[in-house]
């Protein structure tokens, strides 16, 4: 079977999926994840019919980092039979000012993407590592990069810019926005299952270890909460979200911190983890009776409500609100509390539907429809990859 491999590489996990190329379109064949890199690594994979292919705990010393995780994944993939690999698609967080749509990866493209590593140090190096590996071991297999920033690139300049001298915008200092692959998938899925909603004013909340929200009008990005980097906007697992730049100046000058120390603070020691002093995992915080956990959750929900108001203003009102990603799809308590913050816009939560994990969790008469919709970034990447190799 002709197939595509889709890779989504992070610092602590590696997700990869195989899609068969059929006459009717793409058919998911294998879904795999190697998580707990360097701590409690485990490789799990299932076939399309749900059959477990592997569920193996690995020695942490054998998988201390992403390069070793990639080697483990490569070796396991080599045991699979019946797939004729036609292309590899990758999630790449930052496309900078140059890439506004998915692109076939060549050496010059890879070099350009590497130049954006300082803009996404938590993600970009990990995104590029499997590309380099595949270039070495499968040089004849085309690779495609799909960017989290691309979905937002159609916005107006006055929306994208910062109030800095124009030369900075021309040098690429602008509000890029992220999680675009997820938002693109949700926008397309809404057109399929709720076309009247898709044509309206929609806020999508991608709430996971990384979190942001996006305002959609007729399926297009109008405004989003993240900006130049994936530090901005909502508080996240280990990132602070919106922060007065004066705080950074204070840390550098008055506190005497180095730029690297500030970067480590903002990317690894802030957010839910920093506020609570307990964990970056919302599930753990919700299960804790420690007041610091409640404090972190309160802050997260407060910021969600504030940013939803900003996005509703950008849309001129609100017709629907969609929860997606790890927290959005799975945490009924967080959905309930965020929905409370939307009551002034006309959102009325149906608690029973919310607790049951229904796809629509608003009451029948709610002015704002509340939806829960699983995202599928890997499928979106596979679609773009297939389109590009067919157009060659």
UniProtKB/Swiss-Prot annotation:
First-listed, main subcellular location of the protein, grouped into a coarse class: cytoplasm
UniProt xrefs under SUPFAM superfamilies: Actin-like ATPase domain
Key words, A-Z: ATP-binding, Cytoplasm, Kinase, Magnesium, Metal-binding, Nucleotide-binding, Plasmid, Transferase
Listed CDD domains: ASKHA_NBD_AcK_PK
Catalytic activity, as annotated: acetate + ATP = acetyl phosphate + ADP
Residues annotated as binding ATP: 15, 206-210, 281-283, 326-330
Family: Belongs to the acetokinase family.
Cofactor(s) the protein needs: Mg(2+); Mn(2+)
Pfam families per UniProt: Acetate_kinase (PF00871)
EC number: 2.7.2.1
Residues the UniProt record annotates as site (Transition state stabilizer): 179, 239
Protein name: Acetate kinase
GO terms of molecular function: acetate kinase activity; ATP binding; magnesium ion binding
Gene source species: Rhizobium meliloti (strain 1021) (Ensifer meliloti)
PROSITE patterns: ACETATE_KINASE_1, ACETATE_KINASE_2
Example GO BP: acetate metabolic process
Subunit structure comment from the entry: Homodimer.
Keyword DNA damage (UniProt): no
Residues the record lists as binding substrate: 91
GO CC, one annotated term: cytosol
